[in-house]
Each structure stands twice: as C-alpha cells, then as structure tokens.
Amino acid sequence: MVVVLIISMLFMAAVPAYQRVQRKARASAIANDFRVFSAVFQAKAHETGAWPAEASAGVVPAGITTQEIKTDIWSHASPMGGKFDWDNNQVHPGGTSPGGRWRAALAINSTADAPLLLDYALMTEIDRALDDGNLTTGSFRLGFGDCPLYILEP
C-alpha cells in the first residue's frame, strides 16, 4: 500500500514536468517553422518585388516552389493542430493597414481535417521565442479567431 502511494506521488510530480517539456518542444518546433517560412516569403518578396498571392490554409501559395519550402510541413497539421496559412492583406485584430489589415503575415488556422487547439500557454511560449511574450503586441500575436499570427509586414 505504501509502495503504491509513493509511486502515485512520484507520478503526480512527473506529469506536470513532462507536460512542460512537451509544450516547450512544440513551441520550439512551431517557432522554428515560423522563422523558416518567414525567411522564404521575405526572400520571395525581395526577388519579385511583391508578396505572394493569398492562399488557403495548408495550400502553398503560387510562386513558392518545393525547392524553397518544405511543402509537407506546410500542408500537414502543425504540432498544435491547424495548418500554416499565408495571409496577404487580410483582416486581423490590430491590423495597421486600411480596414484593419496586415500587409503580410503567416498564420496557423483550423481546417476540416486539422482543427486548431487554442492553447494560450503554448502560444505565449511561441511568442517568447519569436517576440516579446505578449500576445497582444509585437510581430507574433493572436489573429482573427485567436489563431497564432506572425506578422512580416504591417
């Protein structure tokens, strides 16, 4: 009986630590994906003089090739659910362009086959890795429907 009690207490102490490690790993993976994808889109805009056209979540925008971006990561569910989405001149909270739009941004949005899990602790962890740790300011923030949004050009 005492052995069971000790094991259960150790398990109770280990679970939160394991969850923190999992959250940190997910946040690091997503932050890295945002960095890599933003570099691709910024390079494309520099080469062509314009941002790529708007595309749906999980769909690689026209003009972006498989040599430039890992399409399997873009088109499959992210570690927090949802799929990556290129937002060109789309409306999101706090948008600074006319009509409350952001000129260029990367988001993760829900799709029918990949629902987005709204984990604010995870998004705050991503914000700490990419920006200022505040989901209402800076280049990483909550977008429309509280989706994670990484702003490339206001």
PLM-predicted stretches and their roles:
Residues 141-154:
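Short, low-complexity, Pro/Ser/Thr/Gly-rich segments in the mature regions of secreted, periplasmic
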Residues 132, 136-143:
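Short, exposed beta-strand-loop hairpins at the edges of beta-sheets
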